[in-house]
Design a protein with these regions (language model features):
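Short, solvent-exposed beta-strand/turn "edge" segments of beta-rich domains on protein surfaces
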Residues: 64-66, 132-133, 160, 265-271
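Juxtamembrane and targeting peptides
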Residues: 1-70, 153, 186-189
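Hydrophobic/aromatic beta-strand elements that line small-molecule binding cavities or substrate pockets
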Residues: 122-128, 168-173, 254
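Charged, low-complexity intrinsically disordered regions
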Residues: 183-380
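Exposed beta-sheet edge and beta->alpha loop/turn motif
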Residues: 1-14, 132-192
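A short, structured loop/turn motif at beta-sheet edges
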Residues: 127-139, 174-179, 281-286, 330-331, ...
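Hydrophobic structural segments characteristic of membrane proteins
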Residues: 102-150, 157
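Core segments of small alpha/beta cavity-forming domains
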Residues: 44-117, 197, 201
């Protein structure tokens, strides 16, 4: 129930605070290309497929390409309808689990990602490995395609974002018996220099799922951090999703916000600001709450509360000196689990340079991280 879920909430945010406190940032760059990046190994992959087909009919090139096309088109339909049961039939257990969590997050956020009018312009073999005993056979097919892609609110049909443009993706299949199962999808914009190994390892160690390159699919919209001008330019990487104790869905990711949303330490305007963000789904809506930490820097960009927010004073005077709280409803802010005295005391003692923001039933804890550091501590 609600009370049971809230008991886990403070522990979860303590964990996210601890994670953020151990990290410094990394430079994030985007390599924009389409199918070209996947052509680099295409000739070798095609040769592998043809050679394997001479002794194994499952590798027959035309059949393999046609099957990959069918999965590509079927997945778009099932994804648009949040049909996990159908997707589970042609994906590996690992990948279907990952997709299931993403679908769960979409439902909790009241969203759906509709991809229709799909048109495949080209399909090529991008990678292939023919194992001697068939246990590790794998093949990747890269697609150049077009589609009407829109993220929308389920209740109202309101578009959050939309696109209709050519795109490239690499679809990875692994062999299970006499079947090929979809095991993942790669984007051409993936850049290994943005990889944070400790986040990837944390996902592996805790039964969570990691994606190097991630879009704005599950990004909150509104509040202070994700105003429309920042949301539309956000670049999300190192995305981790999983279930924490108590069944609470948690995400961790790095995010670059553009359009000058921040200042350098010298007080100069900055075109890009890097954040490490922890995000959880709350068991109910708390309206809008913003907990802003004052780091006493004269160069720091002060938070201006969104329209409709009012400043809220807590009973603890020292806390008010370090943190400023804004909320759309003072009573809802007072009932918010993370603003109870024990958590506020812990947050104060840790002295973590991070803010907390609540947008309805989504809570995020975020901290600015340096763009020129390359070292990351391991997850706690």
């Amino acid at each position: 129930g609600l009370v049971f879920s809230l008991l886990y909430l403070a522990d979860l945010m303590w964990f996210i605070c601890a994670v953020i406190s151990t990290f410094v940032g990394a430079a994030i760059s985007v390599f924009v290309d389409k199918l070209k990046v996947f052509r680099q190994n295409s000739e070798a992959a095609t040769n592998t497929v043809h050679q394997a087909s001479s002794a194994d009919s499952l590798w027959q090139p035309d059949n393999l390409t046609n099957y990959a096309r069918q999965v590509f088109e079927r997945f778009q339909y099932d994804w648009s309808n949040l049909d996990y049961e159908s997707i589970h039939k042609y994906t590996t257990q690992r990948y279907s689990n990952h997709i299931g969590l993403v679908m769960q997050a979409l439902r909790q956020m009241g969203r759906r990602n509709v991809v229709d009018n799909v048109r495949i312009n080209e399909a090529i073999f991008a990678d292939a490995h023919d194992d001697a005993n068939n246990q590790s056979d794998r093949v990747s097919v890269a697609f150049l395609a077009e589609a009407d892609d829109r993220l929308e609110e389920v209740a109202t049909g309101k578009k959050i974002r939309s696109a209709n443009e050519e795109f490239a993706e690499k679809w990875n299949f692994v062999r299970e018996g006499n079947e090929w199962k979809l095991d993942g999808i790669n984007q051409p914009t993936e850049d290994v220099s943005t990889l944070i190994g400790s986040l990837n390892k944390f996902a592996e160690d805790n039964g969570m799922y990691f994606s190097l390159d991630w879009g704005r699919l599950l990004l909150p919209k509104g509040g202070n951090l994700f105003l429309p001008r920042y949301f539309n330019s956000a670049d999300v990487n190192n995305h981790v999703i999983g279930v924490w104790d108590g069944g609470i869905l948690v995400q961790l990711y790095t995010c670059v916000l553009k359009n000058g949303n921040g200042f350098t330490d010298e007080g100069k305007n900055k075109d890009e600001v890097n954040y490490l963000i922890g995000q959880i789904m709350l068991p109910k809506s708390y309206g809008g709450i913003l907990v802003d930490r004052d780091d006493n820097s004269i160069f720091r960009k002060r938070v201006i509360a969104p329209f409709g927010y009012k400043k809220v004073k807590m009973e603890w005077g020292d806390f008010n000196k370090r943190y400023t709280i804004f909320a759309t409803n003072e009573d809802q802010a007072a009932s918010f689990e993370l603003l109870n005295p024990s958590f506020m005391a812990w947050l104060y003692d840790q002295d973590i340079k991070a803010n907390i923001e609540v947008m309805d039933n989504i809570a995020i804890l975020y901290a600015r991280v340096s763009s020129d550091e390359k070292r990351y501590a391991e997850m706690l």
